[in-house]
Amino acid sequence: MKFLGLRIDDHDSNVTYTDGKKVKYCATERLYGIKHHGWDNIWQWEDVLNKWDIKVEDLDAIAIITDDINFEEGESYRELDMGFPCRTFAVDHHYAHHLSIWPVGEVPHTGYVYDGYGNDNHSFSLIQGEKVSITHDAEEYGSIGTEMANVGIQVGLKADPQGLDLAGKVMGLAAYGLIDKEYYEKISQHGFVDIKRIWNYKSWTRKWDNDFDINWLRTVHEYTGDQLALFLSHPVGGDDIIGYSGGVAQNCNFNGKIRKTGQGVLIPPHANDCGLSLGAVEFLRRRFHEEPFSNEGFPFWQDDEAPEEEPDDRTIEKAAISLRDGQILAWYQGHGEIGPRALGHRSILMSARNRRAKLHLNRDVKHREHFRPFGAAVLKEDTSKYFDYDGDSPYMNTSVPVLDEGLSSVTHVDGSCRIQTVDGDDSFARLLRKYKEMTGDSVILNTSLNISGSPIASRIWEAKEMFSKKGINTMVIGNNLFDK
């Protein structure tokens, strides 16, 4: 059967189509070059179908995620009459988040979703099977994502019009503070449900009578992560593996705490709203009792421009030499990644031991705040050599302690690093192995191929435009290597 999943809203619109075998995916920010792009009317998604040469009349069912629909308590979907020639459903925002886990593994029975807000202003939902069984109202209890974004506004961080990037920036900023143990104990009286009270800065100012204090941010951020990890480590059904999604699941610091508990958890790389259309087609698959979809090629499913060739051994060797010599290397291969992290197809790479890399990349290449940290890609078999971690982290969504003090460019001020474990034999893994052969190191700095305020490059000309500006020394697009 032919299914279409649509995320239609004012930000992070995306489309997924499947014929039961292949999956097509488009995040419209990559299509239009506007970060967090959202459709302002319900028909713009036809542009994507036209690009894919798909007609609405050929579809068997459509599922839509939009935050404008109110669902009854416990209701996870509703059939709509929108005049389409096929059955059409609205799916609850948080339920779709949970179902979107399917490309990384079987969707667990129990799922926890935390984000800014979804349908009915819910900031948290507990999913059990097909039922949204427990929810928290953002207006009453607050929202982790929203409260963190509000902090970003308070301290004057640059933001997109809706403040969607602020929570991530605040996550990086929090590490610069110190934990106030007395205040940590004070807010512990609120438990974990009342996020508004936990993130109430006025209670801190009443204590210290000062302007914004980074120690307050570090303390409440640490407390929130600790409580979240404790909560998820005791799942309602006692499940061995749970699902965890929503925008808050992009918080690598929190994810590191969760994984440290030993609780089995599946966190997709598209945990934010860019994955909702994937959840929509999974809803339709279940509704119509179809076979599970193939996840072949995941997470490199972006409908963007891919080079015609892959890099050969000689090109990979030249790229590794560039990294060995301390150069900044842009790497554009295949189709782009789903989600906000670059995982080796749309990357800017550099030595993890360059002391000036963070300053140089933030100031001259990415054009973003000086305090922003960088992640690392490491060969999976060597992970424990560099980091206090021995598991998988293929999607760079977990922060772990750094063991090697020499990894200055990827070590955040709190001694942690967001890591991507790499295995297999694709071109990125081959590059890492060649670099290891030359230097003895199998870890490099890996950040996304974009500048602040723009989406990750999705067209070859966009990558070349970045290369033409200050900062990047070498670029590899497919099998073509460009030097300055």
Where in the sequence are the language-model features?
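Flexible beta->alpha loop and helix N-cap segments adjacent to enzyme active/binding sites
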Residues: 7-34, 82, 86-98, 103-172, ...
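Active-site pocket-shaping loop/turn-to-helix segments
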Residues: 30-40, 218
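Extreme N-terminal starter segment of soluble prokaryotic enzymes
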Residues: 1-4
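Short beta-strand-loop/turn "lid" adjacent to the catalytic site in phosphate-handling enzymes
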Residues: 50-90, 100-101
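Phosphate/pyrophosphate-binding loops at sites that engage ATP/ADP/AMP, CoA/4′-phosphopantetheine
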Residues: 44-60, 232-240
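Glycine-rich phosphate-binding loops at beta-strand->alpha-helix junctions
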Residues: 69-71, 241-257
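Phosphate/ATP-binding catalytic cores across multiple sugar-kinase/actin-like superfamilies
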Residues: 218-242
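Active-site cores of enzymes that catalyze phosphoryl transfer or operate on phosphate-rich substrates
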Residues: 172, 177-219
